[in-house]
Amino acid sequence: MSEAKRRAAEKAIEYVENDMIIGVGTGSTVAYFIDALGRTPKRIKGAVSSSEQSTAHLKQHGIEVLELNHTGTLPLYVDGADECDPYKRLIKGGGASLTREKIIAEASKQFICIIDPNKQVATLGKLPLPIEVIPMARSLVARQIMARTDGQPVWREGVITDNGNVILDVHHLRITDPVKLEQELNQIPGVVCVGLFARRCADLVIIGSEPPHIL
């Protein structure tokens, strides 16, 4: 599995150009990408990071971490996913960094998702759907989710996001219309971000098969 992640990550380096400022996501596959960034002879101007974890990793390789407010639109964003369907729609948020990931994806011209083959699914929803929630609204949001969907929200106890919020993981969802569900869940008061990347899906998916496959 680690080899598949490494293959996807190293393939993504081909899309990095000198003097770029790139967006960098979070997770085990992205960690391989950051390591590959540190080894490549290409020299980027810096990176916008989606988490404190990735920020620390980038700095270990001497890569300057920049604020999105100061960079404007980014040419490229590279991140992983928990699930990916044939239409490049994603479930993300296993690492609890979904809000910053969605912000950077929206701010980027090209969003490349790097995954191992096991992350491919015919229909999203095999894994729980993470939702970042304002702490005081946790119970309200959970009730609203149960009223609006067939899902079962579970509080990810002990996890606080980099934004100071909590995560509800919604199990047993039948996601037949990802864009519609993303919009509906976003309307619940107290929801900060839904881990469905359907409206802003990936532009390119690199699957770390042997050899890597492009979707």
UniProtKB/Swiss-Prot annotation:
UniProt GO cellular component terms: cytosol
Pathway(s) served: Carbohydrate degradation; pentose phosphate pathway; D-ribose 5-phosphate from D-ribulose 5-phosphate (non-oxidative stage): step 1/1
Record keyword Transferase present: no
One Pfam family named in its UniProt record: Rib_5-P_isom_A
Keyword Ligase carried by entry: no
EC number, UniProt record: 5.3.1.6
GO-annotated molecular function: ribose-5-phosphate isomerase activity
Record: residues binding substrate: T26, G27, S28, T29, D79, G80, A81, D82, K92, G93, G94, G95, K119
Catalytic activity, as annotated: aldehydo-D-ribose 5-phosphate = D-ribulose 5-phosphate
HAMAP family: Rib_5P_isom_A
Family: Belongs to the ribose 5-phosphate isomerase family.
Quaternary state and interactors: Homodimer.
Protein name in the entry: Ribose-5-phosphate isomerase A
Organism this protein belongs to: Xylella fastidiosa (strain 9a5c)
Gene for this chain: rpiA
